[in-house]
Amino acid sequence: MAQNIFRLVLTDEAQTFIECLPEAVSYKIYYNIKRVAGGERNKELFKKLENSEIWEFRTLYNKTAYRLFAFWDKDKETLVIATHGIIKKTQKTPSKEIAKAEAIRKEYFKN
């Protein structure tokens, strides 16, 4: 069995977001994360946002787009920190959500 290329850490907000979704949706989100952590390279599942250090886990379920924002921490071990999630309603990722993830990232590395 292949070793994961990163370990996912969920903030409380990201955890709450996933737990509040229907079980089938949260299962698919975790399934897609597991695929990416296992080494699958697929921009439909995990994509770096332009002009940012923020990435998004992308899940499509019943024509609804779910996004979980995240960033990398490779200091001691390879971690991906998931900051928060949204149910995407527009084509473009809302800039306020990217800014929120960037603020959480900045605070994380300050400590």
Where are these regions (language model features)?
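Conserved catalytic cores of phosphodiester-cleaving nucleases, focusing on short active-site segments
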Residues: A82-T83
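Basic, Lys/Arg-enriched alpha-helical interface segments
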Residues: M1-A65, K74-L79, K88-N111
